[in-house]
Amino acid sequence: MAEVETMNKKFLYSFVGFFPVLLLSYGVFTKNSNSNYTTNSGTRSSATAQKTEIVKGKNLKGTQFNAVDEQGRKLNFQIKDVELDPKDSEKETYLYTVFYLDSADSQWKNLCTPDAENVAKAIPLTGSWDETGKHTESSDIITFGCTSEVLAKCIRMGYKPWKTVKGKSLRDYHQACTRMTRADYCGNGKSHTRDGTPINIYDELGIQKKSPNSEMVFEAAWNPDGATFINRPRWFETVSEIRQECPNKLKGRINEDGDWTTAQKAKQNLPNSLLFNDSIVRKRD
């Protein structure tokens, strides 16, 4: 499905948006002998299929299918275009331009909104995410994450959930990235950031590396369930305000004394931390 080259660090940006745009019953798209497209979990063609051919990648261009969007609506969809992600040095990530048929005016419309680079495409991922941001793996469901939202952005940062790096699966790294990018400290789906906020992301696998000589300060350490340690909030909330949101979860995981610590110390005390980030120190006026 997808990976990216390790990015030259300008700085990455945090995003409020999360929720995936499409869930659908998934196996593999297939093409039978009379050229009707189906999924292996969907309704088969009325014609007898003598041969089933797996269709993937660019061969999916033009495929139409029925599926369910994030609001539970059954809609008609079409894959208008498929291309390799130009940011993926391994050339294994496909970007899909997915349209849906709007019943209000019978017009085909792009499912995704354009991102900062004016790209309105999606990357498919197995499983689903609920309103809290929790991921449930399933071989029968895929989720299309738009390039303007965190599911796809974390893949393009290098955290491909189907990959293994240095013997470690990147599934949990991808999930931790979705929490970190949105400053979802409690792991309950609530964001504590603003669109376009610069952050410096790094990990011990070397997928993302800390930028030297930045004016940013260590903010938090992360795993798939949210923050494992909060040194200081990204924006104007105080640590006490965030603690009130999930007091039991963050007990002993917040910098209480006001002396800022480092990611290295957090890693020593909390070895289950996967990702770390720095951010700009902000003060209320």
PLM features: residue spans?
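Eukaryotic low-complexity, mixed-charge intrinsically disordered interaction/regulatory segments enriched
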Residues: 37-54
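Long, compositionally biased low-complexity segments
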Residues: 56, 61, 66-285
